[in-house]
């Protein structure tokens, strides 16, 4: 299963930037595990988006864990919206990632 995570900053950008290095290190770990396929900030910079691949049988538990362990969430500078996603067009391309 795929999912989109919309990250919205809850604090001023200067507060968010204090935790950006640890947030990016966390995301690199998810990428190495094959969970994170792509990520990046929104423009203008008021949050970001993650494209995730999670096991069908543990999707909600995995998504909750991803959210709860993100340093942005742990330090209270951002919140997540999690959207399980049923990919139609392009699914075969994502499956190759």
Set out the residue ranges of the language-model regions.
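Conserved, structured core segments of small domains
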Residues: 1-97
